[in-house]
From Swiss-Prot:
InterPro entries assigned: BTB/POZ_dom (IPR000210), SKP1/BTB/POZ_sf (IPR011333), ZBTB47_BTB_POZ (IPR049524), Znf_C2H2_sf (IPR036236), Znf_C2H2_type (IPR013087)
Biased composition (Pro residues): 719-733
Listed name of the protein: Zinc finger and BTB domain-containing protein 47
Gene that encodes the chain: ZBTB47
Zinc finger (C2H2-type) in chain: 436-459, 463-485, 490-513, 520-542, 548-570, 576-598, 604-626, 632-654, 660-687
Primary localization class, coarse: nucleus
Classification via SMART domains: BTB, ZnF_C2H2
Protein species of origin: Homo sapiens (Human)
Highest taxon of source: Eukaryota
Amino acid sequence: MGRLNEQRLFQPDLCDVDLVLVPQRSVFPAHKGVLAAYSQFFHSLFTQNKQLQRVELSLEALAPGGLQQILNFIYTSKLLVNAANVHEVLSAASLLQMADIAASCQELLDARSLGPPGPGTVALAQPAASCTPAAPPYYCDIKQEADTPGLPKIYAREGPDPYSVRVEDGAGTAGGTVPATIGPAQPFFKEEKEGGVEEAGGPPASLCKLEGGEELEEELGGSGTYSRREQSQIIVEVNLNNQTLHVSTGPEGKPGAGPSPATVVLGREDGLQRHSDEEEEDDEEEEEEEEEEEGGGSGREEEEEEEGGSQGEEEEEEEDGHSEQEEEEEEEEEEGPSEQDQESSEEEEGEEGEAGGKQGPRGSRSSRADPPPHSHMATRSRENARRRGTPEPEEAGRRGGKRPKPPPGVASASARGPPATDGLGAKVKLEEKQHHPCQKCPRVFNNRWYLEKHMNVTHSRMQICDQCGKRFLLESELLLHRQTDCERNIQCVTCGKAFKKLWSLHEHNKIVHGYAEKKFSCEICEKKFYTMAHVRKHMVAHTKDMPFTCETCGKSFKRSMSLKVHSLQHSGEKPFRCENCNERFQYKYQLRSHMSIHIGHKQFMCQWCGKDFNMKQYFDEHMKTHTGEKPYICEICGKSFTSRPNMKRHRRTHTGEKPYPCDVCGQRFRFSNMLKAHKEKCFRVSHTLAGDGVPAAPGLPPTQPQAHALPLLPGLPQTLPPPPHLPPPPPLFPTTASPGGRMNANN
């Protein structure tokens, strides 16, 4: 509420509604939510008109002073009531349907606890014969007026503007509920002379006396006279539940040093509202403005707030006056300088307060005499102050708290108003105070509290992470960042993979270890996946674009990862290493299969036949043999298969494709197992021809033996000569003839 009060006083542009008193032409900015929370009148008004931004109140019974005090109570939880403004506050509270404040003011009027009003105040006309009549019917029946169905309030819109509402009096004057004829203002003040005290105004016979018995009358200077020099202080403490906490009579004091008996402070009982020095100064300025407008002639008032924040006092200063005309002239002079000039002069006078307080027993509040011993209420108030731990006025002055009052002469001079040059200087000083620039950035603040908060949050207390350099406003955010992003490593229990965030581990367990259900499926092939991101990656398989090409062999791929895996075949790199035996592998699935050797068992085991597998892909294909599921169907013949590779192999029988060629003879095969068997056979024949070491014919090329090494292959001519390594046949006849031979031959 303190911040909202600052907006109301210094930043009216931030308020969302303006209260306008049409007869007086006064504007009061406020907040809808705050007004609706305290006043039933504003609650019903804003409920009916939700876009309302301007409320014009054309009510004769609503005065600016009363409305200002009501707003001060709503925003600061303190209501300052004296004999000068109690009727205005009561009227405003009754019209705005604030029953608690109206009841409290009515009780004060009935009990006559406020004393006679000051000069210029408007008092109700009372019969001169009796001084203690009952309360006027206007204040007794004000609640009935608010609830009477016969007097409805009129809400009239002004023109086509839907954001403005005018509230006027309902039926004018009604019998019994309108105040009686209010007489003219009766001035009541004293003229001090050497011979004594004489009355300068009319006789106060029509004014009510204070209750308190003969002893109280003696303190006030007798039953028939009223002296402000000898008056006592009456403090009435009332909470919002219309319960009077206690009524105490304060010590006697000098004129202007102590609060008048017409001053009563109404505050909340809990005392939880604490205000800064700036708010106290604002309240003082508002009170001074009200006194000047009402013409009370009571001078400036200072508000002194106790440590509990639940009780306050209002002090008045008496002005030297000799006649009613002179008093009016002094009031005009006081209205000349602004409230800011009075505030600056008051601060200058406060510096000389201690010196002025030592000059005499009447120089300050600390020099007041104790009340008479027969005053039981004064003793009770002092005991309550001691019980709360409130320091004495002298101790408060030593501690640098509220400064004591200056001497009467200085006070009267300041009340008349400082020179014009001092007033201009005070205005400049106040404007300088309202602008607090930041030393490190070009921002400017109207309040020092906002500047300090800006410095603490933006410049001074930025929390920086030592590892990554990120900046945080709060230390708790930095600690959370370190636990989640920088230092914390969460490992998977199954495979030991580390993660920085817990949700990454959950996703890993769902996808890799199969703890989750595949909820996302492809619209084309109805294949299911764990996440939608996997579905988008899978959609590449249905496209014909292959933008990734191998520079070595020219093979194209649809994904960049497939090209990286393929490039390992050409480079021979084995990036995956086993931590147990340091054996390296080219692919990650090979490492996973190898890890089953160290673990002692394979990760996936069939519950039907007990067969185990290293990879979940093989395990899923095996499980389809038990369930009989064959989701892959040939488009040509309609035959179904358990896996996609088997269906692709079968499709080659229809297309005649033979993608596997032999490196030795160039023959092509449809399946990889057929090529493998052919390579074994081809290698055995070629190895036998090369192991005999027979040189090739001189006229033949070196590849000639390879041409004769395949005599059994189909398609080759069968009239080839025998291999040259075979032994020659034996000769039929001997090359040399002997005599015996001849004889035999001849025989």
